[in-house]
Amino acid sequence: MTVVRYDSIRAAEQCLRETGGNGSASQTYDVLRAVERCFWRCLAYFAFRHFAYALSCAFGIRRPFRIYAVCDGKGVVLCAPLHLGADGVWSVVAGDFVELDFVDFLYARRGLPELAEAFAAVMQRMRADGICSVTWRYLETGGVTSELLKCQPHETTETFANVRVSFAGGAERFDATLPRNARSVERLARNRLRREGRSVSFSFRSSTGLGEGLSGREPRRLLRECRRVYLGRQKRRYGHGGWLARLFFMHGCYISLSVPGGSSFVAVLRVDGRVAAYMEGYVNMARAALEVPRIAIDDRFARYSPGRLLIAEAARWLCANSRLRCIDLCRGDERYKLDLGGTLYETATVRVGTGGAK
C-alpha cells in the first residue's frame, strides 16, 4: 500500500481531482467521494475552508492541517485528516474543532485485515514524519478504529454517553414498543395542544431528496429562526450566546455549513406558526441512520413536550418515506431520549503513540 501526504486540503483536493498520471492516488477521487457519502464525517474535514477555520486563523489559533491517504490498486483504503500541534510532534484527528460529534479516520468498505494493514502503514508514515501521537476525540467505541487499537497500547482519558433510537421494525412496531410513559406523555401533549386550539405542523427538509428541499430564501429564513432557538438554548444551559457564538453557530460550524450540502436534514415542529422544536443533522446511508447532533426546543412551548413529539413524528415519517431506520441523537443521555426507546453507546477520547521520537 502507498501512503500519500497532503499538507493542505486544497492540495489534497487538487490531486484527488486529477485523472491519469501520478499513480493510483490521482485516480481515487471518485472512491474518496464514495467514502465521503458513506461516512458523513468527511463533510467537516473536506469543507474546512469555511468561516470557523478562517476565524481561527484570524485569532491566531490556527493549527497546521495534514491529510494522509492510504491507497492500493483499487483506490483509497484509509483517509486520516489531522490537526498538528505547533511543534508538529502531536496530532488530533480533525473534526471536534467544528463541533463534530463523531471523529475517526475514514475507511473504505474492506475486510479488517486490509484495514489493519492500511492503519499500520499510516502510523508508520506518521512516525517517519516525526509525529509521536494521535488523539481521537469522540471516537465511537466498538468501531473499526477501536477494533484495530486492541492490538496496540493506547490510553482512554474520558468517555461520553450517546443515545440512538432505532425503529427497524417500522412505524407500527416503533409505536408498539414505546415505553408506556412515552406514549402517555405524547398523548397528553397532543390533547393539550388540541384542547387549547393550537395549530401544529411538522416539516421535514433535506438536500438528499427526502421531504422538501433546503435551497432558496424560505428554507434559509426557517434555518435562521431554528438556529436562534438553538442559540437561546445554549445560552440558558451553558451561558454561551454572545455575538461571537451567534456568528459561529449561524455561519461557522459544520452543521450550518452543510446546508445546502450533500446529506443535511432538518426537521421542524411549529406551534401557531412559531418554531417550537427542531433538529438538524446528516443522513448516513451507510448506517441507514439520521445523525442528529443538534436538537433544541423553545422553552415557551415546553409544556407541550415538543422535542419528544418531533423525534417520534420524525421516526414515523422516516419509516414511511425512506430506508432510514435509526435516529442517532448523539452526545447526551437525557431522560427524554431514553424514554423514546433509545439505547446507550459510548464515544471516547483515545490517545495512541506512533512510536516516533518525542
Language model features with spans:
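A conserved beta-strand-loop-helix scaffold within acyl/acetyltransferase catalytic domains
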Residues: V4-S91, L139-S146, K150-T157, A176-R303
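Residues that flank catalytic or metal-binding motifs in active/ligand-binding sites
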Residues: L78, D101, T159-A161, F265, ...
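Acyl-donor binding region in acyl/amide transferases
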Residues: G85-T157, M285-L344
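Short beta-strand-to-loop capping motifs
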Residues: Y107-R110, V165-F167, S206
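Short secondary-structure junction motifs
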Residues: I131, G197-S199, S264, L324, ...
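Conserved catalytic-core motifs of GNAT/GCN5-like acyltransferases
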Residues: T157-V165, L344-G355
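Active-site-proximal, glycine-rich beta->alpha crossover segments in alpha/beta enzymes
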Residues: T159-N162, S166-R180
